[in-house]
Amino acid sequence: MKNISLILLLCVQSLWVQAQTLELKQWRMMSSLDVKDTEAQVSAPSYEAGQWQAVTVPTTVLNAMVKNGIYPDPRFGLNNYQIPDVSDEFNKRMDLVKYNHRKDGRNPWQDSYWYRTEVKLPKTYKGKKVWLTLHGINYRADVWVNGHLVANKDTLVGMFRRFKLDITNYAKPGATNCVAVKIYQVDHPGVPTPGTQLKVFGPVRGHSYDLFKDETLKISGGWDCAPVVRDRNMGIYQKVTIEATDKMILEHPFVTTTLPKKDTSVADVKVQMEVCNTSNQKLNGKVQAMITLVNDVKFPTYTKHMDGFLKPIKLTKQVSLEAGERKMVEFTSADFPTLLIKKPYLWYPNGYGEQYLHHIKLSCLLGNGVSDSKEFDFGIREVTTDLHQIGDDYGRVFYVNGKRVFCKGGWIQPDILLEETEKRIYDEARLMAEANMNIIGSEDMPSPSDEWLESFDKYGLMWWHVFYQCFRMTPGTETEHNPANHDLAVTSVEDMMLRYRNHPSIIAWVGCNEVLMDESLYRATKAKVKSLDTSRIYIPTTSYNWDVDELTPYLKEDLPTGTTDDGAPDYNWAPSDYFFHKVDEVHLQMFRNELGMPSVPVYNSVRKFIPTAESTANVNSPIFPLDSIWAEHGAWDVSNYCYRSYDNAIRTMFGDPKTAKDYCDFGQFLSADGYRAMFEAANHRMWDITSGVMIWKVNSCWPDVCWQVYDWFLTPNASYYFSKKAMEPVHIQLNADDFKVTVVNASHQALEGVTVTAKVINNDMSVAWEHTSQLSVGADCYKPVVTVPQNGTYTYNYFVKLELRDKSGNLLSDNLYWYYSQHMDFFWFSTMEKPALTTSYEVVKDDREYEVTVRLKNESKRLSFFNRMALTDAQGEEINPVFWSDNYISLFPGEEKEVKARVAVSDAGGVTPKFVIAH
């Protein structure tokens, strides 16, 4: 009976601690210009704020005003030019003053904004320590609680930090409390220069250069792939919480894992945390830890069950703290042998194994009560890295649990107004994982919301975390000492690491992308990283393209980095064989961390953000349908850097489009072949030259026509599905440079007795050449099989169809390529009749998702080429996102195929979706 009572007591204590955290979501917002009362009055619970704007936090100021109908959504059309900027100079230049919503004419973004909310604190908070945490603000803040100033803008500064404030003396448990936060603009909002991108193939919009001085998001001032955000994203952009503890608190827990045996049969787990006495008297207590295996992994729309059993690991340690003392407490296998876990369930990257997670709960006990508690998931895994050398070039190689990982993925951006939901975050991570990506980076997300890293953990997406973004500081220029406040920068790095370091998905800490900080910041950052985490490599920069001896000799101790985006390929269209030739050159290609090309969305997306898309008024223009709106949304170019070559290829290969839909459809052919080639070029020399490849970019921060494989609406375009095919662990491909059929096995299991079939099919459907052979392919390698002859006897357009099957005849991989035998001519694709496929489908509701099974058959005597499949809702509108096993299906006469799709019940409006072939 005593044991049962103890268990019940611990359960009650656990629930009490968890129940003490409150998220404050519903707020009121008002410009300080319109608030004449004092701060103490505004933050009093009795204050009347009914006339203020109702907002849901997290939100920036501008996004709140868009939601409330004060300004149009800047992400669509040219709406951004109907919103005044924080820069008066820019407003005058672009005549934006007339759009100011303020009747007094004052700039709406230069002064502070109040965010105010009221919350009834539980009575159980009485006698406890009460903490208010701001998880992300931009840029400075004063915080008031119940008429009292808790902290001011001199200490609450920086976008990439959390702020935990002790509000015990001002909180009123059992009563209504007011929290009021005054948010201030960034210190250096800058002037957008030029800030516009309205000419097709014209100059890029540039930046707001002064913004680089602050610890804030640089793309808020404009970028080649991002519009100028008029308020520079000032606001409370991450959640605000209140929690209660007793006098002994836990902070900065850190779980590290190593695999001391090469066969990974044993894991050594180490747990550490800081324990702090917040009182003015000595405290004696205990620290407890409980580690369990996570068998049911939760996602927003489904739950994934993971097999396995681990007996819960329970650890206890006595701790004694003097008044105000802070102490490091550790649990190690030397003292607690159960932390040596036999036959551990390991976390692997996507495509290399399961993503097993473990859960740890840490508690501080004082007397019979829980003083503080923290819990989170972690993964048992070990990341190591080394360099592969060819001549003077180096490629970085990552190993997870002793197995080398061929890195395939790309870069992402946040929504330009920082608007996100947990579901959208997980949807994006799922799109990446289902595309067979395993590595993701961002130069624009130094402090992502926790859900991003949690989703990467669950989907097996390795993440290298970039501290200082991109091109904020460039050696040898006037920006080299940015950011202005180095102490703030390093403090921000410290909080990033403390916040994220328990995530198994993080494989490297990266100083910045493409550039490098000055020596003082470089050394301070490196020292901070080494003091907080030695389990991961620190890479000071992803790339460098300057005279190191002259400008950054201090960098030499961290060279070579083994990754780069210097030189070509860059970010424009090129023929597929170009990427293969570049890889064969070796130089700057061994771990290519950025390359890309434009990738126009499907027409159904384009028409949503380009209002002129449905017009044919300018059909005779040589650049139809492109106009200033297309330019603003990505159709720019300088020195053939971006969009011009892509557009030229569309018109040269497929003819002049008669509608915007024609243009988007032609673009799908081009993007599919180009993005596939970027990944297959890396595949064709896997490990003997290449160890990784990352595209710029995976997603878009706003509706855009340039670099992406799925668009802002979460609609994948053709480049997504052809990249997905190229990144599959077991893959068959045709090398674009020498027409060799190659089997790529990036898995760690050998392929035994597989069958390769290759055919050349003319456009009249006759088979001009074919080959079949059986072979075995070792683990983690590639094998050339046969060369497709190029003898000039094929029709003007022809196809190469590849299949790889296992011993039982099951399809492992397939691929389809289209070629011209003369000139760059695919006009046939734009004029040929597409036979309708015979289709059937079944829909099954599975918890919170629908699974749709589609069967397709081509009963005609002609090719049915590039069929884009979609699901529609009750109104006939296309549903997104939908997670297709394959898409853009081509079937030759007599062929059939089964494809599966999954979609959230909520995204379908709760109504059974319908299958369509989109036209």
Question: PLM features: residue spans?
Answer:
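Bacterial Sec-dependent N-terminal signal peptides
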Residues: 1-21
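Extended carbohydrate-recognition surfaces in non-catalytic/accessory domains of CAZymes
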Residues: 20-133, 155, 215-238, 246-248, ...
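Carbohydrate-binding surfaces of carbohydrate-active enzymes
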Residues: 22, 273-280, 367, 620-887, ...
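Accessory beta-strand-rich segments of carbohydrate-active enzymes
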Residues: 28-34, 64, 104-251, 278-279, ...
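Extended acidic/polar, glycine-enriched regions
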Residues: 169-176, 272-389
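Low-complexity, Pro/Ser/Thr- and charge-rich linker/hinge segments at domain boundaries
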Residues: 200-220, 247-253, 381-399, 821-840, ...
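N-terminal carbohydrate-binding accessory modules
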Residues: 363-432
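Substrate-binding/catalytic cleft of secreted carbohydrate-active enzymes
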Residues: 439-637, 670, 674, 681, ...
